[in-house]
Amino acid sequence: AKNKSPEMNIICCVDDAPEKVGRSIMGIEIMGTTEDIPELVERCEIETILFAIPTVDDENKRRILSICNKTKCNVRILPDIVQLIANGGKDVLSRVRDVRVEDVLGREQIELTDLTNTLVSGKVVMVTGGGGSIGSELCRQIAACGPKRLIIVDIYENSAYSVQQELKRRYGSALKLDVCIASVRDSKKVDRLFARYQPDVVFHAAAHKHVPLMEDAPEEAVKNNVFGTYNVALSADKYGVGRFVLISTDKAVNPTNVMGATKRLCEMIVQALAQKSKTKFVAVRFGNVLGSNGSVLPLFKEQIAAGGPVTVTHPDIVRYFMTIPEAVRLVLEAGAMGNGGDIFVLDMGNPVKILDLAENLIKLSGFIPYRDIEIKFTGLRPGEKLYEELLMDEEGLRQTDNKKIFVGAPLKLNKDTFFDHLATLKQIAYSNNSDNLVQALIDLVPTFHHAENNYD
């Protein structure tokens, strides 16, 4: 298409069915297949490419977008026909969107069942860390399911306020919403919140998650992640919560950094409590989330906007990715099906090279990698792996009714010994002795191999 304000002038079409080449659609000729896009762009002086097959499979979407990226055209994506019909065919151009990194990654959406509605509909639901990237999306999706009451707990008032205002605008008085500014480290405050609201379901998303920062402040990671989880989980057990869902991470598997080790301890806490509690404690473990606070995508966008360079730690580093809504669908679905002590993991497809992600984002921003925007390799940070794992060998794996969700068998823990060691860890953490603390983590988490100076 050529851009002619306020509308576009459609010049030609392409279709991957060779037999359609030469035909016309409403007077617009089909002049080739997708492989012909670069040549047609040059010959017809095309400025914008409209991607009008949003239901195409992931592999072909990536292939076609890769061809489009070889041109200097602005690439836009049309909504699917269902969206257009739902809108009465009005304002079509306003619904055309830019290509997003998610389109290039091609993540297949998780299909939810009625379990999710059963979990939260008509229930009192508490979300800790409810102002964060995952927590706020949890609140959005829970609110859409019609809870009896939604309680957002967060220490950061600005993010909590933002979610509160968004949900008020969307639901008004139809949603009973309470926002509580509180730290999960404060066991007495946590206890009072549970006594007051008597939640049926708790999603525990509050945590420190930045690997390099937690390497420099391991005592803060332990206080917030480990004992924040301990406080919330104990209150859930005390007040008879039906389900407790811990938001975990693939960095908890064979951890090489403090943050991952603390998240593994969080999993061990809920697995230990599950042995004696009527509350169904489960954990949901997933990889990196696109666009979350502090994740690589916003960082790359900032670096591109500043003219570069885009910093990648290692040319071979790979990560599993999913979108925030996808991650939350997993949490809700798995939380609904879990039994006590289960750890759920997502079939996350193929890992993505961070270098490929950086190059694609530069292209999507209208620049050419290494020419317009430089990519700089900075070296692995302390505790950082080239690749992440999703499951420890001893956990085993079986598929659930959802083909994208798997569950690992609960590990057997001597809960009395475990909680004794946890008490020792707490004493060390609050003495702010970082050296002894890391060793205490190693003693508690047998799979923790601390890579203190891992720059290779």
Model-predicted regions and their roles:
Residues 181-201, 383:
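Conserved Rossmann-fold cofactor-binding substructure of NAD(P)-dependent oxidoreductases
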Residues 115-119, 268-289, 293-456:
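Strand-loop microenvironment adjacent to phosphate/nucleotide-handling motifs in alpha/beta enzyme folds
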Residues 86-87, 204, 208-267, 272-274:
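Conserved Rossmann-fold NAD(P)-dependent oxidoreductase catalytic core, especially the SDR/UDP-sugar
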Residues 125-143:
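N-terminal Rossmann NAD(P)H-binding glycine-rich loop of SDR-like oxidoreductase domains
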Residues 34, 61-124, 237:
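Flexible, Lys/Arg-rich cytosolic regulatory linkers and terminal tails that connect or flank
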Residues 1-74, 155-162, 169, 177-178, ...:
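A solvent-exposed beta-alpha-beta segment
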Residues 62-78, 149-156, 196, 201, ...:
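NAD(P)-cofactor binding segment of oxidoreductase domains
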Residues 41, 45-47, 147-148, 194, ...:
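Proline-aspartate-enriched helix->loop->beta-strand connector
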